[in-house]
Amino acid sequence: MNLSQRVKKLKPYVPGEQPQDRKYLKLNTNENPYPPSPQVKKFLQNLDADRLRLYPDHLAIKLREKIGERYGLNKDQVFVSNGSDEALSFCFYALFDSLNGKLLFPEVTYSFYPVYCDYYGIEYEKIPVTRELAIPVEEFVKRKGSCGLVFANPNAPTGTYLTLKDILYLLENYPPEKPVLVDEAYIDFGGESAVPLLRDHKNLLLVRTFSKSMCLAGVRLGFVMAGKELIDALVTVKDSFNSYPVSTLTQKIGEIALSDESYYRSINNKIIAVRESFSSDLGKLGWTVLPSKANFVFTGKQGVPGKEIYMKLKERGILVRHFDAEKVRDFVRITIGTPEDMERLLGQMKTLF
């Protein structure tokens, strides 16, 4: 079969395991351990299925207005998508062109970024992280000949975090005509969003998801906040690919979830508290734990390979995530679950290591 040479060169993103062979405690894909808002459940129980014979609103006006209300923006500053991965994909296609230089992102970050670059033919440079696995803002600023910047904040898979002051410094010292994309998938677990910086920085884009802090990974809903010019570019890409990417159900669930801010604040505060307690407990056991502002921790123990930690826990029915990259191969990423989940995990870690 004759296939495109482009396909033969691609190295697809590898998601976290979703095994079916047994029942695991899943702490490997950063899913929220709590259910969605009770209001979402009520909507689904009373769903008017007749609405599904009609196409969704391709502009997602009500959802975009709702997002705008939450973050102090108007709907023209909001773009919605089938999960934040789709939003990121559209951003890469619409904004980054190797004719304007290489795209920059940290060497340790969300592993979908180089996949998008290969898919769209975008040249890129990975910027080394610090010894503490932090994002080196100064190194980004030095490379003004690049076509743009992309980084997750908090970073994935490390959980390390740039303050609003750090991001402002970067924006003020990087060419204003070049896009700066901040992936804020985990920002609701203790970080401070860069939304206030959108007003004065027209090259800034913030990508968000309903999967993590809003417990809706199975729905697939993401969004971008940026100036109108950048949002219009994303709409052009969307309408050239699929003018109806976000379903009627997804749009309505997103609207309802946004109406129950107090519920989500409550459960995410629980996750933050468990994260801090679990990190402290690991530290007392001699584990290295990176400071995290996400719903996971990145941890390792001297003398124990990360792969071994992953395998031994899997044998005990607990899934965590291991990455093979050189600087992080001695770590594992552990999603924060319920207090009971983390007690079970901690007990196994005491026994095994």
Which residues fall in each region the model found?
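Active-site phosphate-binding strand-loop segment of PLP-dependent enzymes
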Residues: 125, 130-188
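Short acidic capping loops at alpha-helix termini that bridge into adjacent secondary structure
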Residues: 74-78, 101-102, 177, 184, ...
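Conserved PLP-binding catalytic core of the aspartate aminotransferase-like
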Residues: 272, 284-316
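N-terminal "arm"/small-domain region of PLP-dependent enzymes with the aminotransferase-like
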Residues: 1-54, 145
